[in-house]
Amino acid sequence: MARGDAGRGRGLLALTFCLLAARGELLLPQETTVELSCGVGPLQVILGPEQAAVLNCSLGAAAAGPPTRVTWSKDGDTLLEHDHLHLLPNGSLWLSQPLAPNGSDESVPEAVGVIEGNYSCLAHGPLGVLASQTAVVKLATLADFSLHPESQTVEENGTARFECHIEGLPAPIITWEKDQVTLPEEPRLIVLPNGVLQILDVQESDAGPYRCVATNSARQHFSQEALLSVAHRGSLASTRGQDVVIVAAPENTTVVSGQSVVMECVASADPTPFVSWVRQDGKPISTDVIVLGRTNLLIANAQPWHSGVYVCRANKPRTRDFATAAAELRVLAAPAITQAPEALSRTRASTARFVCRASGEPRPALRWLHNGAPLRPNGRVKVQGGGGSLVITQIGLQDAGYYQCVAENSAGMACAAASLAVVVREGLPSAPTRVTATPLSSSAVLVAWERPEMHSEQIIGFSLHYQKARGMDNVEYQFAVNNDTTELQVRDLEPNTDYEFYVVAYSQLGASRTSTPALVHTLDDVPSAAPQLSLSSPNPSDIRVAWLPLPPSLSNGQVVKYKIEYGLGKEDQIFSTEVRGNETQLMLNSLQPNKVYRVRISAGTAAGFGAPSQWMHHRTPSMHNQSHVPFAPAELKVQAKMESLVVSWQPPPHPTQISGYKLYWREVGAEEEANGDRLPGGRGDQAWDVGPVRLKKKVKQYELTQLVPGRLYEVKLVAFNKHEDGYAAVWKGKTEKAPAPDMPIQRGPPLPPAHVHAESNSSTSIWLRWKKPDFTTVKIVNYTVRFSPWGLRNASLVTYYTSSGEDILIGGLKPFTKYEFAVQSHGVDMDGPFGSVVERSTLPDRPSTPPSDLRLSPLTPSTVRLHWCPPTEPNGEIVEYLILYSSNHTQPEHQWTLLTTQGNIFSAEVHGLESDTRYFFKMGARTEVGPGPFSRLQDVITLQEKLSDSLDMHSVTGIIVGVCLGLLCLLACMCAGLRRSPHRESLPGLSSTATPGNPALYSRARLGPPSPPAAHELESLVHPHPQDWSPPPSDVEDRAEVHSLMGGGVSEGRSHSKRKISWAQPSGLSWAGSWAGCELPQAGPRPALTRALLPPAGTGQTLLLQALVYDAIKGNGRKKSPPACRNQVEAEVIVHSDFSASNGNPDLHLQDLEPEDPLPPEAPDLISGVGDPGQGAAWLDRELGGCELAAPGPDRLTCLPEAASASCSYPDLQPGEVLEETPGDSCQLKSPCPLGASPGLPRSPVSSSA
């Protein structure tokens, strides 16, 4: 079974089966499979005798998976199974043509109605339902010949032509036989597909009987035989000197693209004419068109560009005689989907837009299916742009499923499908409850509701939606309502109309379900117009008043009564009477003859009477000469249309006395309409614009045409006889108003809205407001808002909202993300362009995710290094990172140690940990709104201490002795220095806080008196000299190298720069007093981390010990001491600064002088002080060059900027970007990694040392 491809509108399916018998048993008919999908169609399936087919519902590819259930329909109705048509277990449909009881090829008559028809299937899946294309199943047939070949006589070298015609399914193959033998294939014998046989250059051997043979899968038929006689050339008088005659002219032909077509042209003349082809439009004939035989055109693969009028021209040689024949070729193109709709995923209450474009000839019509059923437009679902655009607003769960665009024309159909997934987030509020609508008047309704039961505290606003509850293509209107409002008065409604209201709640996460709709019927209003009257008098003392009921568009409710007012002429006395609302006429009795009365009517509803009609004047007949004057026609009624009035009536009393009717009408002027003072005569004695129109007595209806819409007209009808005209029946009323044009005719679409302004409402919502276009001639009915994340080019993520107002609250957005908005105006059946783009970012929020790619690595027995990248969803500018760690992960979180660092830091070192201990770490990030979640726990085990890290007993004893001696020397030096320089200018004091330029400096310090001579602890970490202080030349020359108390960054190779200190004089002066209060210049800003733990009190002792040991090694004297500071500071300071930019301030870091590894054999004896001082200095310089940056001992955190700790560069980041971890210990730009600084979380207090 073959199915039609995209180039064919209909695929012919020819099934050829054989009846096989074995051992006397009849085998089942052979089965052929046909695949039904959402594609080009319809498919044509033709079943021959004893043939079967299996129809598969192959919609799995479009449905993204096999269907869970398949249902079939035939001719639009549910399929009923029977012996020759039943469902297979896999959902396929099996059908076959029954066997003829007599074994003939004839179809069983009962099977025709049972098997033949249009079949389609529905595939039910988890996401929805898909409908297949249609398969047209027919039984193979072959009718009798409708045209048999005819005998003919042809001269030698002439052209013979036989033709036969027969109908069949599938189209029969035509062959020809001569003497009941199939004709051989010769260039002279041309068999055309339409059943024509042309014999060129006829010879005597061609004479004989010919017949046509038609064959298809149903049977084979033979035509009647036709005899061909061959005459000698010139023997036929009819052909001698014959003018040009076209024997077989081309015929108008319509084919489907891809089929073949032959345009035949056979001409006769003496001598044989020349035949040529041209196109009537002057275009050249396509090069793929070939000549079949000598005079026929063959288009093997017809395409739309082949369409046109082809002209066959036959010219008689050596003369100017010619004959022409023309025929039109029309090539149809089956529909092809040029732009298929795309699958969409939308949150609840948002807008989805499907776009479908199709081509074909003729232009295909588009229609939409939802879950296999025809889509019915309503207030939320609209089909725009000639069916090519489907817009669904206020999406709900009921809108999820598959949407199919079906393009159809006379050549076939095409289909494309797309799914709509409705995303419902967790934590959304439930639907508002107890929605009520109370009518306040004919045009106002009070809608009230209660807040949702779930997550009510998260609501940021509501939207109220309403539309007419009856009718099709109703427009849905909506209003945005504040969070604190639970009722709204809706105005400008239509009276006596049913409306449907529902409410949706919004939180920062999105929209709730729609509430249960509330139905309300607006109250009646007074009618907006009065019925149109007709007056007539059946006798001199009565006036019959008749009217037509008001249409619903004018009644504004149910008309329950009419009031008729009347009086004499211009007299002030007016009489009135009321009748029920179901009455349409009233007889006014006891009137005076031959008097002018004025009459008017008003209609009333439960709300009261509307405006009355214009006064209508009527003269009653006279009491004299009544035997000859006809009365007025009865029951005059006029149906007002926009440009015409249909006048109908009944004959007056005694109709035999009348000869006919005269009809007059005129347009009432504006001044007369306002005054209403024209008094008609009794028998048509006034001038009228048109008339009289004489009508026969049998006529009872006449239409007045070419009137102006919305104008007031007066109609008069009188009956006449051979004596005179009778009394008039008069009607006065207005023609219907022309429908208000959408706007005056304009060439362009409506302009986009003006003054579009976006304002951030929360982290997930933005208010968008605009105003109507400043200059437009188009009536704006609603607007479409298009928005997407800034810079996005993925069309599937662009969202559309429809708003009837001039503002809309757009929710469900991502925090701290820039969006771009554009607004489009819509007229009636006309869409304008989108306006300029407006950008706005949502407000920040807490981070949704913790810092990513947290890595821990132990550096020393007491130090662990952390490295991380920013959160993948920071939802704002990260102002600081939070580090929690503990050796017991079961402790409550508030008992863990909290460390913080600024938002532009991505690595840190934690010091003061215990060796060979398992620590648990987790990190969080914080924006200005608050902290986000912490990462999952990660653990690390610190390194184990080596034996060489501790000193032996002899070393400790030597150190203690050295410390005591050094303290004494230090005290003596300090005293001597103070005596010599009592008024020395002091250096700037050490600041107890980080300088603004160096946020990485954190200190715990207090001002105090100079250290006493017995001090055994140095509690300050000193700075280098200020930039404006210059040491004496001797100091520059005698500067020695020492282990530094300041540290810098560490490169990836963990190499360290040399640590150097300008050492104080070794003579009696103490360097401690001179440097204790000196403030070090800051080399550059360094990010800071704070700690809650204080370093042990032994820090100063360790530093002093290091200095004394080094002094013992160096052993060279000092000539001068550096300037002493007047104010001395006692402090414990942790400094982490980068001095790499200054050659005068080497990169320093707090370190112990004790090497981790045992001293090499060539190392000088530090305890005894024996050894060459130069050798000791060189050795120490080498050793200090390889030390770690972080010193064991004090429990502290050293924060390393990424530039120093790893090759991880973080440029200035913008919202919408994040950092992605890449190999090489670096993070590259991926999503927001904003640099910010203003820590706001509580930190552990920093205590000053006592």
Curated annotation (Swiss-Prot):
Ig-like C2-type domain span: 29-137, 143-229, 242-330, 335-421
Disulfides per UniProt: 57-121, 164-212, 265-312, 356-405
InterPro entries attached to this UniProt entry: FN3_dom, FN3_sf, Ig-like_dom, Ig-like_dom_sf, Ig-like_fold, Ig_I-set, Ig_sub, Ig_sub2
Residues covered by region (Disordered): 1140-1175, 1215-1250
Segments on the Cytoplasmic face: 979-1250
Glycosylation sites: 90, 102, 157, 252, 582
One GO CC annotation: plasma membrane
Record-level GO BP terms: cell-cell adhesion
Protein's cellular compartments: Cell membrane
Keywords associated with the record: Cell membrane, Disulfide bond, Glycoprotein, Immunoglobulin domain, Membrane, Phosphoprotein, Repeat, Signal, Transmembrane, Transmembrane helix
Domain called Fibronectin type-III: residue spans: 431-525, 527-623, 632-741, 752-845, 850-945
Phosphothreonine found at: 995
Topological domains, Extracellular: 25-957
Transmembrane feature ranges: 958-978
Membrane topology summary: Single-pass type I membrane protein
Any Pfam family matching the protein: I-set
Signal peptide span: 1-24
PANTHER family recorded: IMMUNOGLOBULIN SUPERFAMILY DCC SUBCLASS MEMBER 4, PROTEIN SIDEKICK
Protein family according to the UniProt entry: Belongs to the immunoglobulin superfamily. DCC family.
Name of this chain's protein: Immunoglobulin superfamily DCC subclass member 4
Source species of the chain: Homo sapiens
